[in-house]
Amino acid sequence: MLDRSRLRIAIQKSGRLSKESQQLLEQCGIKINLQQQRLLAFAENMAIDIMRVRDDDIPGLVMDGIVDLGIIGENVLEEALLTRRSQGDNPCYIMLLRLDFGDCRLSMALPIDEPWNGPKSLQGKRIATSYPHLLKQYLDKLGIHFKSCLLNGSVEVAPRAGLADAICDLVSTGATLEANGLHEVEVIYRSKACLIQRSGELSNIKQSLINKLIIRIQGVIQARGSKYIMLHAPAEQLEEIINLLPGAESPTVLPLAGNQHRVAIYMVSNETLFWETMENLKNLGASSILVLPIEKMME
């Protein structure tokens, strides 16, 4: 039985968010041993339990107070909200953070030989989807009448199988659509992974753990989008060089020993550094340019 005094976090057991959710928790310093077939895993160094479940179970577990936190795609969360509201429920949760992974879009797709003249092309069509409420919300706002065909998997095969005229499904690269003779015509919802918390009062111990976890997650996300940069540069080009490298804070600038015309620059840049940027630095007279990844970061 679960120890109710420990913080409970639900993550996807398998699927597109599973690996990155696990990596995020590990990068936050939570030592966990996730065995493939086990529902529960226990952190070795913090009072945290990890529950590994189907992604569409996570919103309900959070809203019903079974777990304290959940990492879930916004698309799954929004569909669960709309489903519960359609049943007369008033679901509650707290959105804590949007995360930096799990990007996808919920899109309409038609057979390649079908013309697209805007949403009106869907009038009276039968549309296969795993997200009936998100689809209905979108098309109702446009005054489009349609028939829904609910499928929980392999939505992209519905037109070829004669089950539907069009589909509404998650798209990452579009390769699966193309392989099934479909083309993406309209994005109706964009989604990322997010961290949600159950509503209601928590113990001071749990709330303290959540606050610590939020700070660590923010640090991990910020570090992923930042680089530590070291270089030597002409003193007279200092301002131009700094403008090429948007930083989290003002850079550290030190004189080079034995050379009063050149300086050493150390800074954290919050933009991904491309080869073009490094070449521009070189053109301004910079040398010994080092770009290093940052594992953790806290301001």
Curated annotation (Swiss-Prot):
Cofactor: Mg(2+)
Molecular function GO labels: ATP binding; ATP phosphoribosyltransferase activity; magnesium ion binding
One Pfam match: HisG
Entry's localization field: Cytoplasm
PROSITE patterns, alphabetized: ATP_P_PHORIBOSYLTR (PS01316)
Keywords, in A-Z order: Amino-acid biosynthesis, ATP-binding, Cytoplasm, Glycosyltransferase, Histidine biosynthesis, Magnesium, Metal-binding, Nucleotide-binding, Transferase
Keyword Cytoplasm: yes
Pathway: Amino-acid biosynthesis; L-histidine biosynthesis; L-histidine from 5-phospho-alpha-D-ribose 1-diphosphate: step 1/9
CDD domains from the UniProt entry: PBP2_HisGL2
Regulation: Feedback inhibited by histidine.
Enzyme class name: transferase
Domain of life where this protein originates: Bacteria
GO CC term (a single one): cytoplasm
Function statement: Catalyzes the condensation of ATP and 5-phosphoribose 1-diphosphate to form N'-(5'-phosphoribosyl)-ATP (PR-ATP). Has a crucial role in the pathway because the rate of histidine biosynthesis seems to be controlled primarily by regulation of HisG enzymatic activity.
Protein name: ATP phosphoribosyltransferase
Lineage: Bacteria, Pseudomonadati, Pseudomonadota, Gammaproteobacteria, Enterobacterales
